[in-house]
Regions:
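Short alpha-helical "packing" element that flanks the helix-turn-helix/winged-helix DNA-binding module
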Residues: 37-38
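N-terminal leader segment of winged-helix/HTH proteins
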Residues: 1-28, 122, 126, 130-133
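Residues that mark the N-terminal boundary/hinge immediately upstream of a DNA-recognition element
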Residues: 31-33, 48, 93
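Charged, amphipathic alpha-helical coiled-coil/dimerization segments
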Residues: 18, 46, 68-126
């Protein structure tokens, strides 16, 4: 039955999380993938497209249009690497850095909406990371 499938539980939960984040991110004018990209850059500014893609499990064909939209919004800059012309480096603008303050409340708001304690959220996150790592080894 559909309800007994792990893949469906993950899929339907992802849909619900995306809907939740869509509402939370509306005031920041970011999509969920754009928010994840900004999280990566807030953690460490100035990264190549391939470094960002590695962390988000996205290929450059998917990431490039997303980065172009962030550039149009003046949140990032895209520039060819001086060391390697094949690489494009992504850096936050001042506007992109300042958006971090507004975004700080989002994880807490998502946790409240999911009605998870911080411990439950951490346990679930760790279990999902473990599952993904095992699947990546296949």
């Amino acid at each position: 039955a559909l309800e007994s499938q792990l893949c469906f539980a993950l899929y339907s939960t992802q849909l619900a999380m995306n809907k939740l984040y869509r509402g939370l991110l509306r005031e920041l004018d970011l999509t969920y993938p754009q928010y994840l990209t900004m999280l990566v850059l807030w953690q460490r500014d100035r990264q190549t497209v391939s470094e960002i893609g590695e962390q988000l499990y996205l290929d450059s064909a998917t990431l490039t249009p997303l980065l172009k939209r962030l550039e149009v919004a003046a949140l990032i800059t895209r520039q060819r690497s001086r060391q390697d012309e094949r690489q494009v480096e992504i850096a936050l603008t001042e506007k992109g850095r300042s958006l971090r303050e507004q975004a700080k409340a989002i994880p807490h708001a998502a946790g409240c909406a999911a009605q998870c304690t911080p411990e439950e959220a951490a346990e679930l996150r760790d279990a999902l990371h473990g599952l993904r790592q095992r699947l990546d080894r296949q």
